[in-house]
Every structure is written in C-alpha cells, then in structure tokens.
Amino acid sequence: MTSPVTLGLIGIGIMGERLLRAALEHASESVTPVAVWDPAPAAATRLAGITGAPRMLATPDAVIAACDCLYIAAPPAAHIPLAEAAIAAGRSVFIEKPLATSLTEARAFVARAEAAGARAAVNFPMASSPAVAQLSAWRAALTPESLAIEVAFPTWPRGWQQAAASWLAKRAEGGFTREVVSHFLFLTRRQLGPLKLLEAQVTYPPGDGAESAITARLSAGGVPVTLKGSVGTTTKDDHNTWTLNGAIRLRDWSFAERLSADGTWAQAPDALPNEKMRPMVLRGQLAEVAAMTRGEAHRLATVREALEVQEIVEAILAS
C-alpha cells in the first residue's frame, strides 16, 4: 500500500482550515498534515480548535523543509514566492487561486514552472467533483452547441466570507468574478476547450468597490458561451447555473441535472447539496495531490489552466 504524502500548509484562514479538516477527517489514506505556518494572531487559536492538527512552525521555510507537498492558502501576493521556494527545495505545490495579483508575474511563473518540470497544481475543486463527473458522462452523448453561465448573490462578499471582506469587497483583488466565476471558467475550459473572450461589460459602484454586475460573450472550443453575474438579485446565499445546450446543467455547485421530457429539471440520483458534497470533493482533490506529489498522472488544474482562467477573468474586469 502506498504511504500518504506529508502536507505542509501556509495559511489557516477559511480555505486553509477547510482543507486541513478534510485532510485529517476524510483523506488520511492520501495525505498526512505535518506542519502549518500563518502569522495572523487568530491562526493559532483556529489551529488549536482542530483535533489532530499539526504544530505551528516558526517560518514558511520550516514548513517547506518538513513536508513533501506545500499547500499555499496565503494572500495571492505571496503565492509565487512561496511556490518557488518550495519548488526549489524539491517539493510539490498545491496553490489556491489566483496564481498571483499580477498577470505578468503569473505568466513568468508558469513559464518557469513548466520549463523546470515542477510538480505544481491549483485548487479548482471541480476537477474532483462527482457532479461534474456526471455532467461529463451526459455531455458525451451531446454535441455542444451553446453554454450559459449565471451566478448571483444577495450581497458580496457572501455571509461566510465577511472576515475577509476588507479585500474581497474591493476592486483591486476581490469581487465575485475572481472568486466564483473563475471556477465556472475552469469547468468550461475542461469540458469544451480553450477560452476566448469576445466582449464584456462590467458595472462598478462608486469608489473602490468590487463589481456589482458583469455580462460577457465568450467561445470555448468554438462553442458560444454567455456569462452573467450580479449582486442583489437572489435570496440564496450563493446561486449559480452552468447549462449546456439547455439540456444538462450544474446548479448551485453540486447538483447535476438534466431536462426531462416534461420540461422539468431532474437531479442525478446521487445528487447532494454542496455542504455534503464538499468533503467528498476535497477527499478526491487530496488523492490527486498525493498522485501529483509522487509524479503520477492527476486530474488537478495545471498552472497553465489556472493562468488561462486568470487571463479571461482580468480581461472581463478590465472591460
């Protein structure tokens, strides 16, 4: 039996805690968390509340030295320096999106990582989603003709993200296009092919706030794509649909559905709400992290795919 790979974590905020808990509770056969670093005062308290959590080390370098794979959930400006330090030390890296705050830096990093044959991937969980696997099976029986993506929020940031509102609510690094639409662009790239932005419109509030609405037309592998996003247009905390040919769709992250003969949407038999699906998805992601770290084939988002998504996101926001 293959031994679990050791995992170091930089950043123990919302995403870091979520992945750490998944590693401890659902993926012990794949990874063993061994070290954490986060300079925030609240991080030690957060870590102390997690049963079986590894110790907090004094520096990022100490975490890199202790692990086989470094998971990076720090603020985006730190992603590339941390990733390059880990790669230089012979570690694999698993990075939260986006790759960087600067597209120029992201492009240069991807070029260096590819040239070096680095073991590096980005955390787009749809790579391991059972609902997406169901969509893929249904899509195999279709000829893709059109895709419609819609996302909507009652407020931005979402309720559970308010602790990070200081930057998520701002135009410079935040907004729902970077945080949420990026996942559906990754899904589109995987399902249909290379992305091309044709036109986009963005609505910004006065001041430095993040976008309140977007519309865009794209193509994906030659298939026409429409994209809409808005704040204040739903009562759900988070509502989204990814609909292919008006016939199959992913709804609210985790419900694979297809159109019935009577015109109603029917869920896949094993459909689950996102909060119940998430542990399964993260377990799958961590199994893929272990495979990547061992140098095996994996399904994780490559740094090239993540860069392609970031290019489209930033082009939309600059429209």
Model feature map: region roles:
Residues A35, C69, S146:
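Short, Asp-centered acidic motifs that coordinate Mg2+ and/or phosphate
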Residues M1-P4, A62, C69-Y71, E288-S319:
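C-terminal helix-rich "cap/oligomerization" subdomain common to oxidoreductases
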Residues I72, I95, A120-V122, L250:
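Hydrophobic residues in well-ordered beta-strands that form the structural core
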